[in-house]
Structure formats: C-alpha cells, structure tokens
Amino acid sequence: MTAGSGIIHQEMPKGDPAGRMHGFQLWANLPASLKMTAPRYQEVNSPDIPQVTDDDGTHVRVVCGNFWGATGPVDGIAADPIYLDVSVPAGKRKALPVDTTRHAFAYVFAGSGKFCNASDPLAVPTEPVSWADTRPPAEADNRALVLFDRGDEVMVQAGDDGIRFLLVSGRPLEEPVAWYGPIVMNTQQQLQQAFEELERGTFLRR
C-alpha cells in the first residue's frame, strides 16, 4: 500500500485452519516530493512470490526487488527496497549480498543464528526479556531485530533449528521525518496540518 496523500484502510488476513499466521508491517518512507502522490494498493498472493534455492538448501522468497535472478511482484516503491524472506538450514553459514549504498536490517521470526558485522547493539529484542537472560549478545532469535553497518554482504550462521528472517534493504532518503501514530510527514507543521484535516474530514483527497 502507498498511503500518498491519504488513505483509510483495513486488512482482514486469513491464517491457517487454526487461525495462525505470520504478519509483518513494514513502513517505507516516501520522499517529500511524493508525499501527496495518489494512494494505491497492491495485493500479492503467496503463489506469486518467487522462491530461489541455493545448493546448501537456503531458501529465499523475493517479495520485492531483485535477488539471485528472481524479481519480486511488489513494485513502484520510492525507497526501492529489496524485501526477502530467508530460510537458512540448521548449522549452515550463509553470505547474502547487499548493495553498499543501502541500509539493511534483519528481523528474525523463527529459529536462531549469529550475524556477523552487525551494528552495536547486534540484536534488539522487540519483546521484553528477563533480567536473568544470559544469552550471548551475538545470538539473534525469534522476534529480534538486527541492524547492519554498510557493507556488501550479510553473513549469518544458523542455529540448531535453522533460522528464518526477513532481510530488508533500501536506499536512504536523507530527509527529516515527522511521525505520529499512522501519519508520517517531513515537518511538525505538516504533521499538525494532516491531523487537522483528519479531524475536519478533509484528509482524503478524491
């Protein structure tokens, strides 16, 4: 979804027979020149997402961008992201190429592993952890966000149960961000104006 000049939306995802599913929401900022672009929505079904498999059993589903010769179905995003769903088998060590001009992060949602040359802190838990947690800081497991310094590859060593993570990279916009709740602008003045329009019922531009 591209929010552009404004959109009100609702998604009703459908999981497996038990109602379970993985759900992720990634916000990619629009440059100031495109903030008021027309909103649009893309629906992509799972069978439409290409998967490539390496000789060591590593699976990569390409949601957006180009990777290992496959092109993802999601397009037209200004930050030009590469959005990958990566599964590395247990005990395998894998190097994944990344463009040096991009910022990159990984979000682990199954298994565990160790990432090399990540920024400090190496792994940022996205849920509270116990004060008695003694796991070494290099271990990134379920619901951990891993931030990377710039480089030309991401190196991961999968744990005993393998590891599955989202690997996302994009071109930095180098613009100020003003964000509150569901609205992202470039200045506080723009943000205030957007909420005033929302209150008046003039937020949506048809």
What is each model feature region?
Residues 1-206:
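Jelly-roll (double-stranded beta-helix
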